[in-house]
Amino acid sequence: TGNVSAGTSSFSMIVLEKELSKPYEMIDMVTTPDGSLVAMVHCNNCTSDLNAWVNLFGECTESFGVKVDKNELYGVLYRKALEGAADCGGVTAYNYFSGEPITGLDAGRPMVVRTPDADFTLANFMRSHLYSAVATLKIGMDILLKEEHVAVDSLMGHGGFFKTPVVGQRVMAAGMNAPITVMDTASEGGAWGMAILAAFMKEKETGETLSSYLNDKIFAGQTGTTLQPEPEDVKGFEAFLEEYKRLLPAEKAAVAAK
């Protein structure tokens, strides 16, 4: 089990049943507050490029004299992405606002790359940017899933990526090839989690563990939804990622050109 956070940056934390076979530069070993061994994959970039494009589309509508509520704009554009091809139809996006150690970049250049015959639609464009927000995290996670054969039963998703119902959850499920559970508090950030830890330290009863405190007092009665990965989405994400990795030299060349 574990959790995945997706906002300005992203990370996954997978609770391990045993130690990994060897150290990996892309994976940090940490522990939960109660001492369980955790493998952590951290990425510097996630939703910043998505946010920039949503703002641009908002500016476009305002140019026609139409001001759209920001939450509605996000919802419309995110849901549009689900109409796109599972592999994004030949449209590849790189969301690098900053460097990304997992892919060997010391700086970032947001990019969109497509072939002349790509199916360049709004749906594929938005889907490629949602995939891009998860792609680097998936590269790191694939070490755990495919090389270390770590079994992930489910992941708890939180962060702004999940604010629009279903969409981010479905994309993350495809990328991680695992069920993603999102609770009503999913869009809350790290400050909320730190406040919960502080409350536990102040209120815990003798012998009470963090796990029982969370299950019995914080999340008891909370509603949430779980989405299973859709096979077509998983296959499409894998195809997108292969093209993403194949075209990474273009991103690196853009960084090198300053």
Where do the model's predicted regions map?
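Active-site core segments that coordinate phosphate-bearing ligands/cofactors
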Residues: 1-156, 161-258
